[in-house]
Amino acid sequence: MSLNFLEFEKPIAELEAKVEALREISRRGGENALDLEKEIKQLEDKCLELKKKTFSDLGAWEVAQLARHPERPYVLDYIEHMFTEFDELAGDRAFADDKALVGGIARLDGRPVMVIGHQKGRGTKEKVIRNFGMPKPEGYRKAKRLMQMAERFNMPVITFIDTAGAYPGVGAEERGQSEAIAMNLKIMSELSVPVICNVVGEGGSGGALAIGVGDYVNMLQYSTYSVISPEGCASILWRDSDKAPQAAEAMGLVAPRLKELELIDTIIDEPLGGAHRDHKATAENIKQRLLEQLKELDAFDNEALLERRYQRLMSYGYC
């Protein structure tokens, strides 16, 4: 897979390019092939050490860049690797079908579940169709419809959060964007089935929260969750979007800080270098955590499940 390298990854990219060049020479054969194998191994070891060093000490701004990586897996990638028999459901039964938010019935390890998530799209054409992963009110109303359907058929709800935010256009506001988000918060807090939310990329403000209320909230290691983007915060506080790195550090938008504040429950590890380097391994990590959490939630009856969720929500903030 051809990768887009971020600025802080460039030394890694240079080493990987050297390794690939030597491999190409080695593939051509010749009397020096065996000697090249030794040099390739040395470079690979050096590259691995550099990756470990680089990714062991990432700042909030670097994590924010990784969360937006164009090759990071989206909900449809997770559906492909984690679920079987996915049947997409469309439309909010009121206005339109929003392609920025995907949902449908699937099986997780044989168990029927409702899967809902943001889809940003790859390539210009798909990004436009998906509205860059920013849902309009009809997207959130579709999610509400699917969650209520899941409750009727006693299926757990699993969400994948990856959006810069809800679409702020005039039409979206006219059709009740804030009401659609608020209604989802209410519905999700009252569902009598297990709800597990996973922040897998950008968790942007109300657009993320609208499918982010659950019994468990998980975050991938290099995902973010905040009320505003670092650039937006910098523009408001300092009138300078170039100060986004400072804003990112101050906002506490990374998984360890949010876990410390008890705003999320679990941090799910990503492969070395980020989820974009190995979609399948990332999906497997999430799948195993979901299976563990569903097993735990199955021990609760409906009343106990709702009480647990209520207490979880009431624990947010400072008293």
From Swiss-Prot:
It is found in: Cytoplasm. GO terms for cellular component: acetyl-CoA carboxylase complex. SUPFAM superfamilies: ClpP/crotonase. Its main location: cytoplasm. It holds the Pfam family ACCA. The keyword Transmembrane does not apply. Pathway: Lipid metabolism; malonyl-CoA biosynthesis; malonyl-CoA from acetyl-CoA: step 1/1. GO terms for biological process: fatty acid biosynthetic process; malonyl-CoA biosynthetic process. Residues 35-296 form the CoA carboxyltransferase C-terminal domain. Keywords: ATP-binding, Cytoplasm, Fatty acid biosynthesis, Fatty acid metabolism, Lipid biosynthesis, Lipid metabolism, Nucleotide-binding, Transferase. Transmembrane segments: none annotated. The keyword Transferase applies. It is an enzyme of class 2 (transferase). It comes from the Bacteria. Gene3D superfamilies: 2-enoyl-CoA Hydratase, Chain A, domain 1 (3.90.226.10). It catalyses: N(6)-carboxybiotinyl-L-lysyl-[protein] + acetyl-CoA = N(6)-biotinyl-L-lysyl-[protein] + malonyl-CoA. InterPro entries: Acetyl_CoA_COase_a_su (IPR001095), ClpP/crotonase-like_dom_sf (IPR029045), COA_CT_C (IPR011763). GO terms for molecular function: acetyl-CoA carboxylase activity; ATP binding; carboxyl- or carbamoyltransferase activity. Its EC number is 2.1.3.15. Component of the acetyl coenzyme A carboxylase (ACC) complex. First, biotin carboxylase catalyzes the carboxylation of biotin on its carrier protein (BCCP) and then the CO(2) group is transferred by the carboxyltransferase to acetyl-CoA to form malonyl-CoA. Acetyl-CoA carboxylase is a heterohexamer composed of biotin carboxyl carrier protein (AccB), biotin carboxylase (AccC) and two subunits each of ACCase subunit alpha (AccA) and ACCase subunit beta (AccD). PANTHER family: ACETYL-COENZYME A CARBOXYLASE CARBOXYL TRANSFERASE SUBUNIT ALPHA (PTHR42853), ACETYL-COENZYME A CARBOXYLASE CARBOXYL TRANSFERASE SUBUNIT ALPHA, CHLOROPLASTIC (PTHR42853:SF3). Belongs to the AccA family. This is Acetyl-coenzyme A carboxylase carboxyl transferase subunit alpha. The gene is accA.
